Structures are given as C-alpha cells and as structure tokens.
C-alpha cells in the first residue's frame, strides 16, 4: 500500500495544492487513494473530498491518544490502495508553537509514515540545502524520505535536484510548476471552501496533469510502499434508534467525518438539512447538531429563513437535545453582524450579539472542563477542544472552563443544561462518550414526544 505524509517548513508552502495534485494523479492511476489531515483543520479535507468523492478524516494527537489515531487511520485506509496525509503548519509546529506534540512530525512518528517535504525554492539555492538539513536532523528519526519542489520551473529543478540530492542524500521526486490558472483563493479562516472555488474540477485536473508530467512516479511509489495498517476489530454499527438533524450547507460545513460516524456508531441516523434553504427541520428528529462554518457570510439568507428560525427556537425551548459549535453557536444568538457590518436577527435562544472582532479570538487548542453535569458533560470531566474564529459574541456563556495547554490562558465559555450545549469551542467527538450521551438524550426526547 502507498502511504506517506506531506509536510513543509511553514504554512503557505503549497501542501494542499501538492496533496490534491498527488491524490488526483493517484486516482487516475487506479490506486483508489484515501486522504487524511493532520490537526483540526476543516477546510483542507473538503478539497481532498472534492478530489476523491469520499470523506477525508482528521488525525489529531491533541484530540486523541496515539492508539485512537492509529485506529482511525487504519479504519480510514481500509480497502484503499494509497493513503495520503497532509500535514499542518510547519513540520514540527505543535502545541502553542513551542512543542512538537500534535505536530505533523508527531503524526508521522506515531503512524510510522515516510514524509515527503514540500519545498518552495524562492530566492534560494544552496542555502535551501542548509535549511532542509536542519529539518532532517532536528528530530531523530525525522521520517523525511524525499523532497517535492513547488512553484518551481523545469530549469530550476534541473539545477536544484542534483545539488539537493548530493547535499542531503535524499531523492528529489519532482516538482509542480507555477499554475496561476489553478490558484485557490483564501480569506480570514484560510482557503475558500471547495464548494466556493469556481471551476474547481478543472483546476484539480490541471494540477494532476502537472503531477503526471513532473513527478518521478516510479521512485515515489517505491519509496512509499508499506504494509497496510492493521485494522482493529470493529464492532458492527447498530441499527439506528433515533434521527439527529445535522446542518450542512455553505454556512455550516465544519463537521468532522469522524463525528458523524461516531453519531451513527451510537445508534443515530444522521439526517442532513440546510439552514439556508430548508424551511423546516427534518421530521421525527430527536436531536439537532449545528456545526461551525461561515454563518457570518450568509447572515442575511439565514435571517430571512424565518420559518426555520422560529421552529428551531421552539424546538430547543421545548427540550430538543441540541449541540452547537462556533458558527452554530452564533446562529443561536440574538443577532449576527455580517462581513459588511449589517446586523441580522438569528434564532434568539441565546442572549449574545455577534460581530467581527477584527482578529483571531482565543485561537488554538484548549481543554474544556465541566463544573456540573449536563447533557454532554459530567462534573470534573475535561475534553480537548479548539477555537478558530474572528467573530465574537457579547455573551459567550460561563458554564464551562477552558484553558490553553501552553501558557495557561483561561476563560469561561459555553451554555449547557440537560438537553443543550452551545459555545465557540469545537468538540472532537470521536473516541469520547459524547456521541453516546447525545444519542441517549435524543432517544429520551423522542420517546417523550412520540
């Protein structure tokens, strides 16, 4: 089985571009690849999904123990001929930027994957070898097995490849040229989502064409051939006992594939709906999940869907088990100011008014602790979470305590009760008791309302 992790020395080096190019080329070659993302990012897996037509999974060593990550990787790789992991940020950048824990290197080390380093040789030649030498020798083993040049001309590749191979003792496996016609734009939370990129499939095809032409496939495939990961014994998915409505559209698109799988494994049927377009919730539901996304970019359309706003408010107030993260939390507030500064009424079950803070707010990983029992949490428990948002609310809640793992910054957040969780923190549900608790609350609600 072909297995590797793509990494770089920094963000913005073209990891996502290279990942999509290689995935598409592997797909053309009949390898039936699957994809993974190191860390908590939601957007890059959307591009993997656009290439493959199947889910891409997140593997995060802050969210999950090593054995859980290995199991998630094996489960996702089962039945595929290639598994491609995309790293996050710089190769060794982990918690707080001062630790290698939860870094791309940590993931490669945990899974035993060869690493292909994506390098953009802008304004450098021999100095590039010195920098790469530092990356290779910073940790032992580094797992770095090869180099891929990005935004590189054929002429520069001919010059750099033999020099880097001589200095580093590592193979240069090819390059991608600059492709202005295949550029994917970005905004305040990173890249545009895959659904928003015009002519995405044509851009992906251009990337794959370039990869076919300029990558040394025989060497890459030979270098990255490994035994498939061992799949732990998987319990059978139980029959669905309750329906959970999950918001999914352009405004609410930040849901981990593993979370939805965990809902199903807990006995729930996942039923998607669009807060932008559907005028009512799905019928006979026992729970409601509102993930994050970009509601601030669609505030007017969300606000004008008044029949759905009214129904969600009524159902939550009548006890419908509900979990709302980040953008979902904003949706449940009193109002949401859009990117143009216009304020729009929202569901109104929470007191806060939200607007652009003009900066990243409480960015990064944290541990979320509960003081008392509620639908999802038990007193004294702590769960890993992350926050990633520019919008903030006048009422973020005070029910839970959040604390960063590095530096110790702490704050109160979230609103909870026996049928409710809402807050800025994104939860990672897989491998925790949270899906079972949510499904149980949904079953109880359904039983009381049938």
Region roles according to the model:
Residues 108, 238-239, 252-265, 269-271, ...:
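C-terminal and late-domain segments of enzyme folds
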Residues 1-2, 237-243:
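A short, charged/proline- and glycine-enriched loop
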Residues 2-17, 23-111, 119-146, 155-158:
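ATP-dependent carboxylate-amine ligase catalytic core
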Residues 125-236:
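Internal gly/pro-rich beta-alpha loop/helix module
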Residues 295-374:
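Cysteine-nucleophile active-site neighborhood
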Residues 37-38, 172-180, 269-277:
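Beta-strand->loop->alpha-helix junctions that form or flank phosphate-binding loops
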Residues 195-240, 248-252, 419-450:
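Acyltransferase
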Residues 240-317:
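Phosphate-binding active sites in nucleotide-utilizing proteins
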């Amino acid at each position: 089985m072909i297995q590797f992790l793509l990494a770089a020395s920094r963000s913005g080096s073209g990891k996502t571009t290279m990942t999509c190019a290689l995935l598409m080329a592997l797909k053309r070659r009949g390898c039936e690849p699957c994809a993974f993302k190191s860390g908590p990012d939601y957007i890059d897996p959307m591009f993997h999904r656009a290439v493959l037509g199947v889910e891409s999974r997140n593997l995060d060593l802050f969210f999950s123990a090593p054995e859980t990550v290995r199991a998630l990787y094996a489960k996702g790789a089962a039945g595929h001929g290639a598994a491609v992991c995309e790293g996050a940020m710089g190769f060794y950048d982990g918690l707080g930027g001062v630790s290698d824990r939860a870094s791309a290197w940590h993931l490669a080390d945990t899974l035993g994957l060869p690493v292909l380093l994506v390098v953009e040789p802008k304004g450098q030649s021999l100095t590039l070898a010195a920098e790469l030498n530092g990356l290779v020798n910073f940790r032992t083993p580094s797992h770095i097995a090869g180099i891929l040049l990005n935004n590189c001309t054929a002429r520069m590749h001919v010059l750099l490849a033999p020099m880097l191979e001589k200095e580093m003792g590592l193979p240069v496996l090819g390059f991608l040229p600059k492709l202005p016609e295949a550029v994917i734009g970005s905004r305040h939370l990173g890249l545009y989502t895959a659904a928003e990129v015009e002519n995405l499939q044509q851009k992906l095809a251009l990337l794959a064409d370039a990869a076919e032409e300029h990558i040394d496939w025989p060497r890459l495939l030979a270098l990255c051939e490994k035994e498939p990961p061992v799949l732990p014994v998987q319990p059978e998915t139980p029959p669905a006992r309750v329906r959970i409505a999950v918001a999914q559209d352009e405004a609410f698109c930040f849901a981990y594939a593993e979370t939805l799988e965990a809902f199903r494994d807990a006995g729930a049927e996942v039923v998607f709906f669009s807060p932008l377009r559907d005028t009512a919730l799905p019928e006979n539901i026992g729970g409601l999940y509102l993930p994050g996304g970009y509601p601030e970019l669609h505030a007017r359309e969300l606000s004008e869907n008044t029949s759905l706003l009214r129904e969600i408010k009524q159902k939550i107030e009548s006890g419908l088990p509900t979990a709302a993260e980040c953008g979902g939390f904003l949706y449940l507030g009193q109002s949401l100011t859009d990117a143009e500064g216009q304020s729009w009424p929202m569901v109104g079950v929470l007191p806060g008014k939200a607007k652009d803070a003009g900066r990243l707010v409480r960015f990064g990983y944290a541990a979320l602790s509960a003081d008392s029992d509620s639908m999802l949490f038990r007193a004294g428990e702590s769960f890993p979470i992350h926050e990633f948002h520019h919008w903030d609310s006048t009422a973020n809640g005070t029910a839970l305590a959040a604390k960063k793992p590095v530096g110790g910054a702490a704050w109160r957040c979230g609103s909870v009760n026996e049928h409710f969780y809402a807050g800025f923190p994104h939860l990672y549900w897989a491998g925790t008791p949270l899906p079972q608790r949510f499904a149980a609350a949904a079953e109880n609600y359904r039983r009381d309302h049938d």
